[in-house]
């Protein structure tokens, strides 16, 4: 073993040790010392603000960084992105997987299922003009996957300069919805530019390939019992679907030539698949819920008004270092960003995912109640995806998986936790579903999502494939009561043991003097 090898190993260990030690470092420019209404006693590490990128980007991206609350995972950093395009990642921070969650009554509470149990979590409002991010010019808002990923790559380069203790971390990117476009493009750029050590991506209910969604909407509705195959309504919607699919096929350049035909198809579904057409519709993000037409879920989740008021509060904006001269209030989704986000390269995303699968693990997970980006479209996408020299999964069987973190649900379901969904993993690609969950899985089932993503980060799904051990449900007695019951049990067990031992000795002494009867020979 050479001296140079030993020195390299020692240097790497020293770098990792210093990195872990530096994670407790406070960066005053971005450090958040307190936030209004945060639970007393909360001591988590929080930094937020901007990296002063205006000279390069003609605008700036807003970030929120929560430090890991698990010493084992201090050198793992997870980027979370919400979709839209143009929807703020503060949704993910305060309604899904951040350590501080907001209720419908504007109460902030500690989220015990936060991903800070698995590493540092970095939420970024992007592209520019989204959430607390801002754009100084109209051109800065004009976006497509290429410009968006370039802007984000520059942000990430500057981030690890400002926070060098994170530069050598193991990084992951996760998100949902239109982040199915963001994440593959960003991941490819990060890997090609070697900005950080990107070790995997996870996309929830992702908008990845438009054709996969439009082609499977009716199949999903039939599978969920909302539409009858062969009915007059099914046939009518199939005719509208055909026009939408034709416009996609004719779009050789990757741009929708007749986008209205696909919009009409979606609107016709929402209008007509209802017991009271034109009055109520199913929630497109959770088909088990109903909404007034034409909202159809746009007002969901219910906490949105409270979140808007909370984040728009001058005290909160000041605490988070928001540029109040650029952003007057927080907006969940920007219609301006959405309208100016071009469809260029949207149709190439599945090919990008195929390329990424040759280098890093990818997980596609789906809340089963989501219509807009549903699991049937995910299955169709995978079955037509080519990677590692093969098309789709070779093995057609799926396995149930179980939430290892879901203590509350374990008790609810009795001795064993119920299966949370199905999972399948081959050749670096994992497909998983989460039952009774919406478009925003961590919002509905934070513990189940924590278990699933933990297994993905650890690259060890065996921890969620085995049925959990039986759970003993202890009545809610006082400590003294429990102590007395335990002591009584110990005394009873000791008494029974003593009796058994005495009986055994007594019987043994009676039979010790007897000589066994010898068998007579034949």
Curated annotation (Swiss-Prot):
Its EC number is 3.4.16.6. It catalyses: Preferential release of a C-terminal arginine or lysine residue. One of its GO terms (molecular function) is serine-type carboxypeptidase activity. Keywords: Apoptosis, Carboxypeptidase, Glycoprotein, Golgi apparatus, Hydrolase, Membrane, Protease, Signal, Transmembrane, Transmembrane helix. Coiled coil: none annotated. It is found in: Golgi apparatus, trans-Golgi network membrane. Pfam families: Peptidase_S10 (PF00450). It is a single-pass type I membrane protein. GO terms for cellular component: membrane; trans-Golgi network. It comes from the Eukaryota. Residues 23-478 are lumenal. GO terms for biological process: apoptotic process; proteolysis. Glycans are attached at residues 52, 75, 104, 197, 395, 428, 436. Residues 500-522 are cytoplasmic. Residues 1-22 form the signal peptide. InterPro entries: AB_hydrolase_fold, Peptidase_S10, Ser_caboxypep_his_AS. Its main location: Golgi. The chain crosses the membrane at residues 479-499. The active site is at 177, 370, 439. Protease with a carboxypeptidase B-like function involved in the C-terminal processing of the lysine and arginine residues from protein precursors. Promotes cell fusion and is involved in the programmed cell death. Belongs to the peptidase S10 family. This is Pheromone-processing carboxypeptidase kex1. It comes from Schizosaccharomyces japonicus (strain yFS275 / FY16936). The lineage of its organism: Eukaryota, Fungi, Dikarya, Ascomycota, Taphrinomycotina.
